Amino acid sequence: MGQKVNPIGMRLQVNRTWDSRWFAESKDYGNLLLEDLKMREFIHDYAKQAGVSKVIIERPHRKCRVTIHTARPGVIIGKKGADIETLRKKLAAFTKSELHLNIVEIRKPELDAQLVAESIAQQMERRVSFRRAMKRGVQNAMRIGALGIRVNVAGRLGGAEIARTEWYREGRVPLHTLRADIDYATSEASTPYGIIGVKVWIFKGEILEHDPQAHDRRHSEAQEGAAPRPPRRDRERA
């Protein structure tokens, strides 16, 4: 089953957590969830050139805190912070809560599955060979420090009449192992022959402790250049 389900959804509350981190009453839940979807869609369209990986939305009391993880923060911030103020005003129109906007830089985009998938899709839209784009993404990830990566592309590859699926893998990608820290993302390439789907799995190691925040903490430490914390072995204490 590990190969059939979404790797992130399978690991929620094990070593991953949600991108929308708030609780609401039943009468308000639908409206707030719709706000999240609209804000995420707007951010990805507005900052398409900034390399946005994910958008974390938290809702403390009567506030809305939006954190954008991007590979090019300067594109969003703009000269003297002019662009980020414009973005904040546009996002404020989606919610009635007080909006706070934070920008987090991704210093190793080669290890981010969303950015790798979008990079491969953009290369195919520029008519780069899909095999070359896949191999380049895999080699860059392994060179930076990934323990394994798998890339799937599906569609009318190379303009073929019949759609097919091809994949490329290097290293280990243990999808059945719940403690495995696996980043997963999808993207689409719009070509003259139709849409080509891209899927990327990146294996970064194992998280032995049961902590939903472990992936985010490990990711932030890796981006800052600090050594990851050693895993806590609860069984050895017993």
From Swiss-Prot:
InterPro entries to which the protein is assigned, alphabetical: KH_dom, KH_dom-like_a/b, KH_dom_type_2, KH_sf_prok-type, Ribosomal_S3_C_sf, Ribosomal_uS3_bac-typ, Ribosomal_uS3_C, Ribosomal_uS3_CS
MF (Gene Ontology): mRNA binding; rRNA binding; structural constituent of ribosome
Start-end of Basic and acidic residues biased regions: 212-222
Assigned GO CC terms: cytosolic small ribosomal subunit
SMART domains with a match to the protein in the record: KH (SM00322)
Record-annotated KH type-2 domain positions: 39-107
Family the UniProt entry places it in: Belongs to the universal ribosomal protein uS3 family.
HAMAP family listed in its UniProt record: Ribosomal_uS3_B (MF_01309_B)
Identification of the protein by name: Small ribosomal subunit protein uS3
Organism, as annotated: Cereibacter sphaeroides (strain ATCC 17025 / ATH 2.4.3)
Gene: rpsC
